[in-house]
Swiss-Prot record:
Cofactor annotation comment: Binds 1 Mn(2+) ion per subunit.
Organism whose genome encodes this protein: Mus musculus (Mouse)
Gene name of the encoded protein: Pc
Post-translational modification N6-biotinyllysine, affected residues: K1144
Biotin carboxylation domain location: 36-486
Name of the protein: Pyruvate carboxylase, mitochondrial
Compartments where located: Mitochondrion matrix
Occurrences of domain Biotinyl-binding (ranges): 1109-1178
Amino acid sequence: MLKFQTVRGGLRLLGVRRSSSAPVASPNVRRLEYKPIKKVMVANRGEIAIRVFRACTELGIRTVAVYSEQDTGQMHRQKADEAYLIGRGLAPVQAYLHIPDIIKVAKENGVDAVHPGYGFLSERADFAQACQDAGVRFIGPSPEVVRKMGDKVEARAIAIAAGVPVVPGTDSPISSLHEAHEFSNTFGFPIIFKAAYGGGGRGMRVVHSYEELEENYTRAYSEALAAFGNGALFVEKFIEKPRHIEVQILGDQYGNILHLYERDCSIQRRHQKVVEIAPATHLDPQLRSRLTSDSVKLAKQVGYENAGTVEFLVDKHGKHYFIEVNSRLQVEHTVTEEITDVDLVHAQIHVSEGRSLPDLGLRQENIRINGCAIQCRVTTEDPARSFQPDTGRIEVFRSGEGMGIRLDNASAFQGAVISPHYDSLLVKVIAHGKDHPTAATKMSRALAEFRVRGVKTNIPFLQNVLNNQQFLAGTVDTQFIDENPELFQLRPAQNRAQKLLHYLGHVMVNGPTTPIPVNVSPSPVDPAVPVVPIGPPPAGFRDILLREGPEGFARAVRNHQGLLLMDTTFRDAHQSLLATRVRTHDLKKIAPYVAHNFNKLFSMENWGGATFDVAMRFLYECPWRRLQELRELIPNIPFQMLLRGANAVGYTNYPDNVVFKFCEVAKENGMDVFRVFDSLNYLPNMLLGMEAAGSAGGVVEAAISYTGDVADPSRTKYSLEYYMGLAEELVRAGTHILCIKDMAGLLKPAACTMLVSSLRDRFPDLPLHIHTHDTSGAGVAAMLACAQAGADVVDVAVDSMSGMTSQPSMGALVACTKGTPLDTEVPLERVFDYSEYWEGARGLYAAFDCTATMKSGNSDVYENEIPGGQYTNLHFQAHSMGLGSKFKEVKKAYVEANQMLGDLIKVTPSSKIVGDLAQFMVQNGLSRAEAEAQAEELSFPRSVVEFLQGYIGIPHGGFPEPFRSKVLKDLPRIEGRPGASLPPLNLKELEKDLIDRHGEEVTPEDVLSAAMYPDVFAQFKDFTATFGPLDSLNTRLFLQGPKIAEEFEVELERGKTLHIKALAVSDLNRAGQRQVFFELNGQLRSILVKDTQAMKEMHFHPKALKDVKGQIGAPMPGKVIDIKVAAGDKVAKGQPLCVLSAMKMETVVTSPMEGTIRKVHVTKDMTLEGDDLILEIE
């Protein structure tokens, strides 16, 4: 039954939750005077202070908190009835170790008793004595017992006297490294240093060899001094792979001692407990009996009173060794409370008031184990970085609760600031179940419910522990973490909502993250998506491809009656008109409509070329994800990509195995037709790309890049014979489809008729595909001429995305062929709806639209031969530099540069080379004659020099001489195919490097992105790791962020939608930040955003750049307590550079490389943030 006592302020529940026995005093024991406690002060902070306050409130006792200057915002001071500052002007830890201030607060405010909590002064006999001397009760053992038990060496002697087995070790604290040497000589390695006046893993260091002895002794001494105010150490033999079992004891002032069974604390890291379990699983009953009886025997030996813990190591043979007594409440007391139903803090207070254990209904025979309890300490430590403490502001805190879950929390709330000064504990989560697996399941569920944003936590690591089969079987020892490296295969939290808020806030404060060429806002009107029928889309040419393979697909195309169209709207059209900036978000919205209404298309060009790197570089999207998502939405129409031969989708040469692997993975992700070309029509490069695409199982479409005019007999370099000869080689190489790729739109109707009819006559069974641009305005006429001459497929873009430097109009071709033998079978009214969508979508990209400076196409393209996309770019660049009126000169220079380089075929990257040389000539006021005459002295653009060296292949007709020799002088020249001499890239090694850098699962697609664009990919991964899945934002939000008071939805995935409202942006704070407020799913959220413009005018410590080898950054926030090197010193890999201290833990920063110290950026006692630059090595 429950026993109550009337006290001031109400009823008091005695120190047991449930008891079947009435309170009876022990017989023949002198009764002490009962002195009720009316006011308790907790000389501690964080969750243990809150735990004691709650117990006091339940007992009707008034509570008093103390706090340091650094803890003014901490929750424990708010949970108490009164709170007082201590340690003014002292270091953070020293404030809670300042006995005079604590005693002064107690005496001045009528405190009856002081509860020490754990850590800090809890095991300091001088503190217990100071309380006693001041007439204030110390809720704990007597000062003498605290002294004996707190001095681990004396406690060891007492254990020996009581007949309790101990680990071989020193009899008293050691005071020199020499004594440590002597002990290791006697007992051998491994040995362990332990702080003589405290626990919790502080001051503990294991040493395995003489070489490690000095460094570990120094660190252990320093840690013990910082944590407990005394650096004394003792040393003992280290028992390998033991279980760490501790027994909870409770004594009163009448000599009654009982135990509350044991806890298993074997899951540790650096002797710091991580997960605690009660009772210990699979513990032999006889061993349990020996452990508990030895614990009671030891407590009686010293006349122990109040709560305490006796700790043991149990070796693999079941032999136990006494370690120490913690004469205080333990962090993990909670699990004992859960399985015994005894409130230990209540009991502590009652014992201090003079109550006996029998009075409280606490008899050994009544203490029973009920089920199993597990405690996890949720901390702001990053398991991926060796559990380094993280600091910062908690942006979101949502805990896991429910049946069987208890939370003992500290300052875990939204807006709380986690400092580097104290322990990193956020909350203790305790799960109680009928057995170990049940408790583990409840704990796992609760941790999965947690949402902590703004600081890193150890929750992913704890979840791995809870799911580990060895843990679930209950057979763990202290090496569990070290022997299970898979525990560190952490599944990163998605944290998508908070990351997106950070992005939106960043844009609201700093403007767009992608360069905006024209200051024009996106259209405020969202494009209307036409109605899409329910059900699967109708069959299309891809169904034929999947059924009959590439050869059968090619036959079907050739046998088709009527003209087939390829739609370039999803790639080349927006590359030409909108600087390749169209986002997956807008492509996905219209994709289902295309699938249902345009199944008669030959294919859709939607991938490859410039879209690949631009997606990562400027849109912060994964190009592979775009392909995957579009494939899912359009399963019936073949996809086509642009493959730059041996350059794949890059601008340089790659090892052959990279090109082959790229095509293989592209095919696996849904790519069908590979349009393979080379910017110089260099056959070896094209053949490699064709082989790679073919071996992947794709449709090979060899594309001959077109320039000149085959209908003009004066243009002899690129004659009909040239194209026919090249076509022969490509057909012989096994192409499934032959393409003429007219990048500048130079094909005139007469040339179309001549070239296509010749190809049709020569290759009657081969599908012919023609690509052009409409810069001149003659694109529709040219494509009709091609169709009439025998072409099977021509390229078009939907009307609102056609014309100018894009492809000819889809609607125009459909209308012109309707009712003729060339009928496309594409419904014209569906083209209108499709076009209307893109007209609206185009308005979202107004800042990138070529019409900002270009109002029409121009027939002068027949003279300058500038490809469509490049024509747009050059036109815009000229206007943005104030040279719009001189664009004519740029085009003239382009013609001259082309002739200087030997009259090239111009398509990326050769077109860029010509463009670079043209701009170089304009900027330097050079004519062709002047540039050629001064070729030996001029510093030409790098792209020009590398072209002349042979880096992109050999142009038709060879390199221009003597210009080439003048420019190159003695630079090396490449003979043959540029990539042929490159060794294979180790893709497995690259994957490992990516995992090491980005710390998450890396896909084959990621590996290939990194192989193609290593720097761009790294920046993309870093950006999205910070800002989340940006492709889920609509384009207006992506470019300019929301307006204040704007409400909107963001769909993360099917069935998961965020409701967001932008509320306000604050003024600038002293750290150069602005606070941005949102409402997310009805709850207030705020984030801090650095104002990049304002920070340029403020001084901050530099950050270490991840990509700069030799820049060493702080691995965690903390204080510099030792610098071991100076500028000019030579260092070896692994050599200590400096020592940081944070949260009472020290970390040695070591050199990752051999070199010389160039500069040291820190001084002793400097406080650093994470990644602050410490020093530079060269």
